[in-house]
């Protein structure tokens, strides 16, 4: 199979976040195949990153982040929206990349919104049942897509992490600049080109 190998994920979250842009996120369940091209990510680089769930240490919720790379970390926000992350870096690092938005490619009705982590999870059928699943399986995997040139990538602060002090301003959010599928973010004047 032409899946991204586990070794792809076993690198720093910022590297993986950049290289996931353009990759295909594939979910094949119940006889249905749903595919989205990743157009927006956020890197969470470990325990020292105060915006990262791992900053609070090893808990039942974050245990998956401290495990091997190449595993899904899916959690709920506001008790109703799922967020899909890929665990990155070395075992014990507590790092992950949040997939914030995808462009519909296959298996999604026209007009399906996939801008934002909750919407993309709903569209692709990703739930807590996918938490801790390996990303190199027929059910859930990522494939190489069309590479996104550096000139087409924007970087800026992550969304919704104002509580993280100076970490809130780090440009760890990456997106395909001209994509119509990225989530809402800072106004254009605050966005930093690559």
Curated annotation (Swiss-Prot):
**Which terms in the Gene Ontology molecular function aspect does this entry carry?**
alkylbase DNA N-glycosylase activity; DNA binding
**Gene3D superfamilies from the UniProt entry:** Methylpurine-DNA glycosylase (MPG)
Catalytic activity, EC: 3.2.2.-
Cited Pfam families: Pur_DNA_glyco
Would the keyword DNA damage be found if you checked this record's keyword annotation? yes
The transmembrane residues are: none
**Enzymatic class:** hydrolase
**What keywords sit in the KW lines?**
DNA damage, DNA repair, Hydrolase
* Annotated InterPro entries: Formyl_transferase-like_C_sf, MPG, MPG_sf
Q: Which family does it belong to?
A: Belongs to the DNA glycosylase MPG family.
NCBIfam families of this UniProt entry?
Answer: 3mg
Protein name, as recorded: Putative 3-methyladenine DNA glycosylase
Q: Which organism is it from?
A: Myxococcus xanthus (strain DK1622)
């Amino acid at each position: 199979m032409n899946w991204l190998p586990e070794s792809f994920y076993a690198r720093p979250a910022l590297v993986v976040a950049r290289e996931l842009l353009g990759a295909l996120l594939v979910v094949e369940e119940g006889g249905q195949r749903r595919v989205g091209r990743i157009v927006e990510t956020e890197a969470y680089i470990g325990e020292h990153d105060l915006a990262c769930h791992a900053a609070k240490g090893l808990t039942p919720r974050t245990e998956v982040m401290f495990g091997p790379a190449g595993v899904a970390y899916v959690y709920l926000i506001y008790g109703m929206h799922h967020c899909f992350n890929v665990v990155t870096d070395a075992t014990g690092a507590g790092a992950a990349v949040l997939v914030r938005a995808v462009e519909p490619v296959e298996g999604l009705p026209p007009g399906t919104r996939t801008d934002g982590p909750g919407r993309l999870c709903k569209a692709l059928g990703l739930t807590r049942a996918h938490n801790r699943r390996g990303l190199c399986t027929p059910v859930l995997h990522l494939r190489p897509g069309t590479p996104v040139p550096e000139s087409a990538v924007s970087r800026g602060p992550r969304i919704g992490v104002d509580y993280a002090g100076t970490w809130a301003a780090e440009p760890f959010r990456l997106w395909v600049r001209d994509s119509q599928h990225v989530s809402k973010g800072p106004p254009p004047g605050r966005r930093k080109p690559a």
